[in-house]
Design a protein with these regions (language model features):
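Hydrophobic alpha-helical segments, chiefly the membrane-spanning helices
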Residues: 1-289
Length: 289
């Protein structure tokens, strides 16, 4: 189960990875970092916005509670990113900032711990996967082929965003955290739409939390490709706001998945409305500033 979640998260987040790495290579910090944080916020916007569309089903009331551990890891990584942006530390090892190193370590250790917990709870599932070798091989081949296409398109998206910022005078933070983030997060939104249409709230929440974890890792992976210091040291102060909002929306997601009942339609929709309004507010803030 955990392996599938990771694979799906990586697959849907490949555009963010290629965009941020490409932006790091060409020296555009705000697109590299803004794309990661902007994608996290847009993912929440997609999840809760689509929940409003499917509100009659009240899908969040039927979700499993095993997303809590993933949510805690997301909160911890968010705290690390906020600390990295606030401190602006210049300490690095081979062009890799201390914040990036901590993120990678926490991400890997966190996934190992979550995987071990899920193995204890779902040990019986192993029996169902013994004869699926051929299917897995075909899936991996398709995954690699699609990955190549995404790698090329993601790089083109980053270069286009950088050129747009230079030619129009628009803020690179706006382009990276809003425009590029929206474009690179389309696979996540489509995955959530499909899951909610099938009434599979667990897949939808798992996809978003898994993708958001990977989006934070994406920033850390992009760090060594930037050669003029560390991404965390050079990032725009506006990105701190995005990091804080992402932290708060993660808390809302964790609280919502714990609910079993809602008093009425409005109380059910209230968290989703809060997230949607918060995202719109962030967009307006970045545009005006």
């Amino acid at each position: 189960m955990m392996a599938g979640t990771i694979l799906l998260a990586v697959a849907t987040s490949l555009p963010e990875l290629t965009v941020s790495i490409s932006a790091g290579i060409i020296g555009n910090v705000d697109i590299a970092v803004g794309n990661g944080f902007g994608s996290i916020l847009f993912n929440f916007f997609a999840l809760f916005g689509l929940d409003l569309i499917f509100r009659k089903k009240q899908l969040f009331l039927h979700g499993a509670k095993h997303h809590v551990s993933t949510g805690y890891l997301a909160l911890l990584l968010s705290i690390i990113t906020m600390f990295g942006l606030f401190t602006n530390t210049s300490f690095s090892i081979f062009h890799v900032g201390l914040t990036s190193l901590v993120i990678v370590a926490v991400y890997v250790i966190g996934l190992i711990l979550i995987s071990s917990l899920q193995k204890k709870e779902n040990s019986e599932i192993r029996e169902q996967t013994t004869n699926s070798g051929k299917g897995i091989s075909k899936t991996l081949i398709k995954f690699l082929l699609f990955s190549i296409v995404i790698l090329v398109s993601g790089s083109a998206l980053s270069l286009s965003g950088d050129r747009l910022a230079n030619e129009t005078g628009l803020s690179a933070t706006f382009i990276g955290s809003i425009l590029v983030a929206m474009a690179s997060s389309i696979p996540d939104a489509l995955s959530v739409f499909t899951a909610l249409k099938l009434a599979n709230i667990n897949m939808a929440v798992g996809t978003i939390l898994g993708s958001n974890l990977f989006n934070i890792l994406v920033i850390a992976i992009s760090d060594p490709f930037y050669q003029n210091g560390t991404l965390w040291q050079q990032a725009n102060d506006q990105l701190i706001i995005l990091s804080v909002i992402g932290f708060l929306l993660t808390i809302i997601t964790m609280l919502v998945t714990k609910r079993n009942v809602a008093r009425n339609a409005f109380t059910y929709m209230a968290p989703s409305l809060t997230v949607v309004i918060s995202y719109i507010g962030v967009v307006v803030y970045i545009v005006l500033s």
